[in-house]
Amino acid sequence: NESAGKSFTNSERLFPSDFKMDKLYIWQKTINEEEVLNSYKKHKKIEAYKLSKNLKNLDVGVWNIWHGGIHWSLKKDGWDSRMRIVEIIKEKNLDIVLLQETYSSGDFIAAELGYYFTTTSDWDYKYQGANISVISRYPIKEVRVAEETEFNNVAVKISISKTQEVWAMSNWYGMNNFPKVFDFHKSRFKGSDSIPVFFGGDFNAVPHTDGGKSPASKKMIEEGFIDAYRNMYPDVKKYPGFTHKEDLRIDQLYYKGKGLKNSFTEVISTWPSGFPSDHFLIVSKFELTTSEENGMNIEK
């Protein structure tokens, strides 16, 4: 894995992003989270999202943003990739986004949206930020990462209302580490009737349902997950659903849980003012039902 990672880094010519610091403040003590927030509020207006008792709809996205959104800049192109990513997520009103190739841009994107943000750390991209992350309109309460797969998977438990929680898991593969991730999350997969699971990302493989040989797609379907796009559009020839500029459907969103109904899924590959990635954005809208029977209620 180490040699493969170094080879990939060299081939893709990934280097630290060229960011400029406006101001630097130094404290002679460790400041707490409230002090951090108060300092941040001076520069950006933010409002905490108030949780409702029950949420009836949830919009989820999956997006590989291509090297942290560094390929278009104001100086060179007249527009900034990262701000375009923010613009699209905001326009689509997404509640949760599973991001890949986040690198040093994840916290920036989350801050611009006023969202919660979680990522991992890994040796290969320690100077650029980690590969995968999750941003969420709603509070992130728990983080799970399997040993030796920080580059491939991060799972977060999110409180989407006062009575509901979901697991959101962002992924990027080479298939070698998929079995480790799958086994690590088995208990969470089994408990999806109580806490639904969204498992999506860049699998770098075409699903078996589309004529590909992805071991991940087969395993996920066997586990009871639903492929959001292919389930809604079963005709592969009529609706190929490509998620990459080379006409491949290598990004997918799988979901599992009794209280979930996928009411709409689309793949966004263009944008009027310019599209910022070589991977396309998957957007799915879910209707949520909550009852004692389906287990989505966490109220004590």
Spans of model-derived segments:
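Extracellular glycan-interaction patches encoded by glycine-rich segments
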Residues: 1-23
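Active-site regions of metal-assisted phosphoester/phosphodiester hydrolases
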Residues: 24, 31-87, 129, 133-300
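Proline-aspartate-enriched helix->loop->beta-strand connector
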Residues: 85-98
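Short phosphate/oxyanion-binding micro-motifs
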Residues: 96, 114-121, 144, 149
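Acidic helix-start/capping segments at beta-turn-to-alpha-helix junctions
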Residues: 102-107
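A short, structured active-site edge motif that brings together acidic residues
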Residues: 117-132
